[in-house]
Amino acid sequence: MKRRRTFDWVSLLKRLHLLPERLTRKTEAEDLLKQLYDHEKSTGKSPDRLTSRDLNLSPDQLEALQLELEQEGFTEPGALRLTEAGRQRALELTRAHRLYELYLAEHSGYAPEEWHRLAHTKEHKLSECDHERITRLLGNPLFDPHGDPIPTSQGAEPSLPTSLSIEELSEGQWYYVKHIEDDEAESFRLLIEAGLTRDSLFRLERIESARSQIYYEGESLELPTFALVALTLRPAQSHEVEAAHSEEAIRLTHLTPGIEATILGLSPSCRGAMRRRLMDLGFVRGSSIRIDMHSPLGNPTAYIVRGAAIALRHDQARYILIHRPSHAQASE
């Protein structure tokens, strides 16, 4: 399934001043509201001492948005202190954002790099009825696709799990990814390209100040060390590594002609429609698989699985994990 790319019409309309001023101001005010709430939650302090520079706004912008929030009853008069109604609205926006990100992950063809932007636009438009409809569709989820907890309709928001710091990581140790921070676009892009996602297991092979190397799904991957900071990690348990076959699993793209392998499962990065399609086609644990033929340009490749020939592109085949063939098989 080809991932969809979208054009950001809302940003274009803003730049051309074609978006209704009231709608633009309300959206920007709610963005500020979330900033104030996040500051209050992360620091435990009232955000009333924040300046326009702290919030990356001009003094005039801050004054206009502050007035908007006051009129809605979300902040106290003449200050940036949140009212209870303001905290509740900030939680509603957070709930809408994370629900919609999960909806995109499970029921759309959009690339992971686009989920945050699309959800940021949609969060201001979803009603409580929309929240409940999406919640039922997704089966009352607790977390978004990155591992962020989804606030409940009653306003309860679980805390993020604690993470090991970079200084606490050890070479040779297996780690379990509990959460990926998507606010830093460059780090998120690098992690997604590597195939890392919530519930991934990897072994840290080398860690240095600038570059680090991990072993993941049969590949040694080099990443800037700053990208690892975006991961919430804990040491993986031995039974988790064994259950996921992390030591012997490799991506289907590494299968060589003439070798028959056994499918171990699908990568945790394979979600939604793509995951359902691959499973429907027979790419499930225990199935035998071999290469039927390569296309003249090498992509796609036809595989024989459950008696049928199925062509997959490289970006689809990398989601399928197989048991690493033994040396005896490879030499036959």
Please provide the spans of the model-predicted regions.
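Short alpha-helical segments that sit at the start of domains
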Residues: K2-Q35
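Short acidic, hydrophobic short linear motifs in intrinsically disordered regions
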Residues: S42-N56, L80, V177
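Amphipathic alpha-helical dimerization/coiled-coil segments
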Residues: L99-F143
